[in-house]
Swiss-Prot record:
Organism name: Ureaplasma parvum serovar 3 (strain ATCC 700970)
Enzyme class: transferase
Gene designation per UniProt: rsmH
GO BP terms in the entry: rRNA base methylation
Main function: Specifically methylates the N4 position of cytidine in position 1402 (C1402) of 16S rRNA.
EC numbers, comma separated: 2.1.1.199
Cell location: Cytoplasm
UniProt keyword annotation of rRNA processing present: yes
Catalytic activity entry: cytidine(1402) in 16S rRNA + S-adenosyl-L-methionine = N(4)-methylcytidine(1402) in 16S rRNA + S-adenosyl-L-homocysteine + H(+)
Official protein name in the record: Ribosomal RNA small subunit methyltransferase H
Main location: cytoplasm
Annotated family: Belongs to the methyltransferase superfamily. RsmH family.
Amino acid sequence: MEFNQHITVLLNETIELLNIKPDGIYVDCTFGRGGHSQLILKKLSKKGKLICLDQDQEAINFANNLFKNNTNVIVIKTNFKNLKSALSAHKIFYVDGFIFDLGLSSPQLDDPKRGFSYHKNAWLDMRMDQSQNLNAHYIVNNYSFAKLVSIFKRYGEIKYPKIIADAIVKERSIKEINTTLELVEIIKKYSPKKNLFEKKHPARLFFQAIRIEVNDELNILEKAFNDAISMLNPLGVVAIISFHSLEDKIVKKVFNNYAKIKLPKEVPINNYVNKYSLLNQKIMPSTQELNDNNRSRSSILRGLIRNY
């Protein structure tokens, strides 16, 4: 894969789930490099509207350049935790479809200076919004042993968090840990030997945990999903692509809260239609997509529709 090339995951499946209305209003909450947005725009009439959100300035620059002559598109630099206020500022209060693609874009992963990858040497950064203060370098070099253990357990579901947390504290007391590959070497050096021979990289879950902490990823999901659902027009859809079990658990929890309401005994079931329904249990990449794009391997798509 070339540097900065990005292949959108579950592209056609997501657009099919949204069932685009030509005159509708659609929000791509995680623009990235605009794979979903560009396909939505092709299906919109001149009356339709597309709103693109991203907190990454490079993504915003890309979107502004891509859509500079298109009056159907509004580009907003913000975290999707600000979804409601960002849309209301543009007098948008109801929407026909939302997309959340929770994965990192390939340009973010492949750009060494962003510090997301455990395969490339870079300064420990991992900020999606590069204007914020907290970064991976601060976490690795300043968080206490107990706090490191906590984020490794909560955000990485790691079975031996104390071993690596202790190793980080020990190594940084000798020399500051500055780069991604320095951290990788510490993880490899102190990990149980059996973990070094697993298919997945031994640093993968530690990097995931630190990245989630840097960007406060999980804490903002539930609010953003609820905000999106509250703004749906009748027959509007929220489509969410998650990339690990922690994200998917939150998606399922929120969707089930709306779609699986327990009725009082006195309400006849035959006369009741829930306001919201699940569109699917889950959609996963086809064998062809997995072959074409290895980064799609852990993705899961779920959808919720407002019935009336």
